[in-house]
A protein has these predicted regions:
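Structural preference for beta-strand elements that scaffold enzyme active sites
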Residues: 45-49, 74-76, 111-113, 160-164, ...
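Substrate-binding cleft and catalytic face of glycoside hydrolase catalytic domains
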Residues: 70, 74-88, 97-214, 280-282
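Short, solvent-exposed loop/turn elements at domain surfaces
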Residues: 56-62, 82-86, 143, 344-345, ...
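Aromatic-rich peripheral "rim/lid" segments of glycoside hydrolase catalytic domains that contact
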Residues: 155, 164-187, 196, 200, ...
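Short, acidic/polar
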Residues: 56-71, 144-152, 218-229, 317-323
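Boundary/entry segment of secreted carbohydrate-active catalytic domains
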Residues: 34-64, 68-74, 78
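Bacterial Sec-dependent N-terminal signal peptides
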Residues: 1-35
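Noncatalytic carbohydrate-binding groove/subsite architecture in carbohydrate-active enzymes
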Residues: 39-45, 53-61, 180-296
Length: 381
């Protein structure tokens, strides 16, 4: 009789090994599955977008470009369409960067947004001054505004879906900001800007865009402004809440009431520049020269965001997106101001050189817990 040299595994051990083996295979499959895509997750709710810079559009920043192509279905240009970039001199229009931005969106079947036509910032001084450096008269400034709006909007007619026609025209108390536009033309500069934009592209959607509209005084000012525009026959399609939020502001209730108040005017609401600042802010921008110990207090996460802060940010995004999802009939678009934490403007404002973590993707382009938190809202629904 031949001697058996094999090893017999007891049946009880086999019964234990098989379930563990199956679990490991299943666990591996789950974590190698395709990452959820934001634009697909929110397709029945609102457009989901990002603001792009030149490096991302040109392909120099391939990491961010790939994230944009995968996750977003609408784009806004950070700077290419602002006056100082596209119309830097009286007789000079520079369309090349903006053309690349629009072509990027068209190539990737994205809804393209124009930001911005009339703003007090990032507008060259020559717009408001004559050759002697003195303020121009009303008619001269109106003509310059008209030429700029008609030239830029016509150049992208039926290619750019909607425009932030006027940006940040209000003070915190809801009164009109005393910008050069206001001082030289008067408050009807807003009506004129919308009229010029509509005439240049009757099919384009026209928006008013501002920050801190979640605060009641400023919101009331915006409501009065929109009503005035509507009373003069302006077809304003929506209002943009910039969405540069803090960890404790606005509350979900403030955001909810803001959306409802604007929806009552018959306009859609868009979150146009969303990010959440995780760093200390109050009383720091006035200090020009920061001491080393002060720098540490206002830049506490230089080495990375701790798990506790990461979880708090995820909860914050979850609360905000629950409110947006609940108001999906009135919220048309949510656009993040940037793509990864690495390229966020908040790394250099209000204090240069800090490490901030305001977006859904980390510095290496990986989704953060905040990403999982917001997609979980829809999946759970």
């Amino acid at each position: 009789m031949q001697k058996h040299t094999g090893y017999i595994v007891p049946n009880k051990i086999i019964k234990t090994i098989i379930p563990v083996f199956v679990f490991l295979i299943t666990f591996s499959e789950i974590h190698t599955q395709e990452q959820p895509v934001l634009k697909d997750i929110f397709k029945n709710y609102f457009l989901i977008g990002a603001a792009l810079n030149e490096a991302q559009v040109s392909g120099e920043d391939t990491l961010c470009a790939q994230i944009v192509k995968k996750h977003f279905n609408t784009i806004t240009s950070e700077n290419a369409l602002k006056w100082e970039f596209i119309h830097p001199k009286p007789d000079m229009y520079n369309f090349e960067p903006a053309d690349r931005f629009v072509e990027f969106g068209e190539k990737n079947n994205m809804v393209i947004m124009g930001h911005t036509l009339v703003w007090h910032a990032q507008t060259p001084r020559w717009v408001f001054e004559n050759e002697n450096g003195k303020p121009v008269d009303r008619e001269t400034l109106l003509n310059r505004m008209k030429d700029h709006i008609q030239t830029v909007v016509s150049h992208y007619k039926r290619r750019i879906k909607g425009w932030d026609v006027v940006n940040e025209a209000l003070n915190e108390d809801g009164t009109l900001r005393q910008s050069p536009w206001m001082k030289i033309i008067g408050e009807d500069y807003l009506v004129k800007a919308f009229e010029y934009a509509h005439n240049a592209d009757p099919d384009a959607e026209l928006y008013y865009n501002d920050y801190s509209l979640e605060n009641i005084p400023k919101r009331d000012g915006a409501i009065a402004l929109i009503k005035k525009l509507q009373s003069q026959g302006i077809e304003i399609a929506g209002v943009g809440l910039q969405g540069h939020y803090k960890m404790d502001w606005p509350t979900a209730a403030q955001l909810d009431s803001t959306i409802k108040d604007f929806a009552a005017l018959g306009v859609k609401v868009m979150i146009t520049e969303l990010d959440i600042d995780v760093l200390p802010y109050k009383d720091i921008s006035a200090e020009v020269t920061l001491k080393v110990e002060m720098k540490g207090k206002i830049d506490p996460y230089k080495g990375g965001l701790p798990d506790s802060a990461q979880a708090a940010l995820a909860d914050r995004y979850k609360d905000l997106f629950e409110t947006l999802v609940k108001n999906k009939d009135n919220v048309k678009r949510v656009t993040f101001w940037g793509i990864t934490d690495k390229n966020s403007w908040l790394n250099n404002w209000p204090v240069p050189g800090r490490s901030n973590y305001p977006l859904l993707f980390d510095r290496n382009g990986n989704p953060k817990p905040a990403f999982d938190a917001i997609i979980g809202i829809v999946k759970n629904n």
